[in-house]
Structures are given as C-alpha cells and as structure tokens.
Design a protein with these regions (language model features):
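A transmembrane-helix-recognition feature enriched in membrane-embedded lipid enzymes
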Residues: 1-57, 109-110
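Soluble catalytic domains of membrane acyltransferases
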Residues: 55-126
Length: 126
C-alpha cells in the first residue's frame, strides 16, 4: 500500500492528465487501435513504476510471439502482475479478471482499454 501511495505522490502533477486520458480512451475504445490503447497504458504504467522506484528486469522477451497469440500465467494474487508484464511485453495483450474488480475505479478504465474479460467465478458455465 505504501508503494502505491509513493507512486501517486511522485506523479501527482501527471495524475489528473493521465486520469482524464484514461477515462477518454475507456469511453471511446472503438476510436483507437489496440496499439494506440496499449501505448497509452504503457505510458501510464512506466510513469507509475518509475514513481515507485521500481526497476523491472525481464528475460526471454524475444520469445514472445508477435502473432497467433500467447498466454501468460502469472502466479501472484495481487494486481501488480499486469503492471510488471505491461512494462516489458512488446505486444498488446488483454487479461482475464474476476468480475468484482471490474467496478474498482482506475481498474475499470484500464480493463475497458485492454478489452479485458471479466468472469464470474461462481458461474461454472463461463
């Protein structure tokens, strides 16, 4: 929690701009290409990581296919996995998340830009 506060405080001048831009892209998803939306999210992600004094190191990025799809299986229950993967992944991707986090401010807009799939974990027919 402290790290998130540090991230916001170090980017306090940019937070209103990023928030407005994120809301605009989320409201007009179909007006932007997947690459444009991903570039905007990467810009916000990079600023957040830099503000939190985080240095993300990656290995094997050259093995990520640029077409025909791929699946990442992060093994952490927190929400930081997506930020770390987004920092280093060269191609746009989406996420599958539980529907409960789909109404959390900020995550709601990020998921809209990513065209994330929200699932109900109680409904086994999904």
């Amino acid at each position: 929690m402290k790290r998130i506060i540090v991230m916001v405080l170090k980017n306090i001048l940019f937070v209103p701009y990023y928030w407005i831009m994120l809301n605009w892209y989320a409201a007009h998803v179909d007006n932007y290409t997947e690459e444009q939306r991903y570039a905007m999210l990467k810009k916000i992600d990079h600023a957040a990581n830099r503000g939190g004094n985080l240095c993300i190191q990656s290995y094997g990025v050259e093995n990520i296919p640029s077409q025909n799809g791929f699946i990442f299986y992060p093994n952490h229950q927190g929400l930081y996995d997506v930020l770390a993967i987004m920092e280093v992944c060269p191609v746009p991707f989406s996420v599958v998340a539980k529907k409960e986090v789909g109404n959390v401010p900020f995550l709601k807009q990020v998921f809209a830009c990513m065209k994330a799939f929200l699932i109900d974990r109680d409904d086994i027919k999904q």
